[in-house]
Amino acid sequence: MQGYGMPPHGGYGPVQFTPAHLPGGYVQPGYAQAGYGYAQPGYAQNPMAAYTWSNYGSNINLQQVDNDCTSLRAAMKGLGTDENTIINILTQRNNEQRYMMRQRYQALFQKDLVKELKSELHGHFEDAVVALLDSPYELDCKGLYHAMHRPGTDEEALIEILATRPSYQLAQDKLLFQHLYNKDLVSYVQSETSGHFRKILLALLQCQRHDFTYPINPQELQSEAHQLYRGGAARWGTDESVFTRIFATRSPAEIAYIAQCYQQIAGVDLYTTLKKEFSGNAEKALCGIFYASINPPEYFATRVRDAVQGIGTKDTNLIRVIVSRSDYDLGQIKQAYRKLYNRDMMADVQNDTSGDYKKVLTALLARC
């Protein structure tokens, strides 16, 4: 059985790639494409400026949103709570529509929708419902804080968030983290990590990684592959700074191209080199960046598996992955999960959850 960060069976496999095409398995809706985090001009001045309902106008049916708000209000009025109505509405809307509900609910009833729901719900069901109403930035920040604020750091959650978000989203996350927790995210990560692992995460937080629009430059990327070879397999010891710089600045498509060049130069795949040259959390971080670049659905499938296997459930991680991917590639993640583990992802999630919490996650998984 494969654990976290492992490549697909048989290695990450040959990626048929030419400069005119992105590598197979890379371009997944929402992963590195524009719009994943709904970034809007003006966010740098106000961490929540991106989420004013007027920004969305043309893609939103305001009457439908208002109807949803009225139904949610009715589900929470009087004795008892109509959990099924809450689940049905929130799981059948996308993140943009749900965030609009927060705006319109306040306008219609002068009440904070999230606070209203938190007062009616409890446990992991509450956590999942609130996550559905979070912006991508809020979901990231809560995940990062949860990974660090308790004794024992969840390094793999840090890797998942920092290694798979485009730079513009990490830049917004840094601003919102300060706004929510009155802490500097970079300083907090620095205080909770160490060694080369810390250097990799801090490099990612510099937000210099190229996005999906960055053009492929074959000559430049071949040079990068040579530098990786000279910094690792071709020498005694490892030049960690070369690996950190390349993996923290190159886009997933560029990393896929570099991997092919590296295979031709070194006669061994890049993933094997990472496993050989690094260890511990630094190895996990670089392998995580690599795997998420080559095949995002399989990478996120390993994160779901990590959350549900063994004793106990990593509920915060499970909720974040399912909610954050539900508008994009959750169906592909389910397929990848079956390919990797010969198991049904929905069944495994259902076996590890219960009650209304189970219903929420099941509804999201059934949508795709």
What kind of feature is each model-predicted range?
Residues 2-368:
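Structural signature for extended repeat/solenoid scaffolds and their inter-repeat hinge/linker regions
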